[in-house]
Amino acid sequence: MSLKSSAKVALSLMDLTTLNDNATDEKVIALCQQGNTEFGTPAAVCVYPRFVPVARKALKAQQTEQVKIATVTNFPHGNDDIDIAVTETKAAIAYGADEVDVVFPYKALMAGNEQVGFELVKQCKAVCQASGVLLKVIIETGELKTPALIRKASELAIQAGADFIKTSTGKVAINATLESARIMLETIRDLNVAEKVGFKAAGGVKTTEEAEQYLALAKTILGEDWVNSAHFRFGASSLLNNLLATLNDQTAQVVTGY
């Protein structure tokens, strides 16, 4: 696949994201407008829950209503209070989110508690399922660090009903890496759930070349046909400009950011 082809595919798999603490209505509207490119639209935009209605209105105004709206809960710290995570998830759905990215209680898992993570995901999944909302579970691979913990968090999230497993919040020192992606993709393969569980690489994927490496990895482990927006996403913001530069034959400017 040519770099241009990869860029076009990657664009269609993006969850175009703004999760900065200084986010405003204007910035969310601008994000939605950025995603309306001559090469197509991203799979979703990802914003804080309170901005979901703003994004909905902006997407409708530019006639790109096919773009899903994702949001985050139990974010970014992945606390182990199940009630709070469920309450936040219910609120996100009430705001009108199509997809919820919930943070797995990874610190509890690191301390040896597997049950709370399973139960938290299970209860959030029940709430999402009742409303036809997709649940992505952020396991925070850069904090889990070890292959054993990354695999265990992936397994627990999947067994509890995750529709996607996602690498990172983008709020810690180490976000998506090819190593952690490989473990997560292999877990999806090994549990025989590729038809119903997807993968999202978030934070740290900034260039077309980097995106292409993740696409190639997913295809190697789960097959060419698996890589589509129902199964694979990139959580990113600065990646978009680099994909567009590739598609427009311009020299990419690496932009800092998620």
From Swiss-Prot:
SMART domains to which the protein is assigned, alphabetical: DeoC
Compartments reported by the entry: Cytoplasm
Reaction catalysed by this enzyme: 2-deoxy-D-ribose 5-phosphate = D-glyceraldehyde 3-phosphate + acetaldehyde
Catalytic residues (UniProt): 101 (proton donor/acceptor), 166 (schiff-base intermediate with acetaldehyde), 200 (proton donor/acceptor)
EC number: 4.1.2.4
Top-level enzyme category: lyase
Its job: Catalyzes a reversible aldol reaction between acetaldehyde and D-glyceraldehyde 3-phosphate to generate 2-deoxy-D-ribose 5-phosphate.
Entries under PANTHER family matching the protein: DEOXYRIBOSE-PHOSPHATE ALDOLASE
Protein name listed in UniProt: Deoxyribose-phosphate aldolase
Species whose genome carries this gene: Haemophilus ducreyi (strain 35000HP / ATCC 700724)
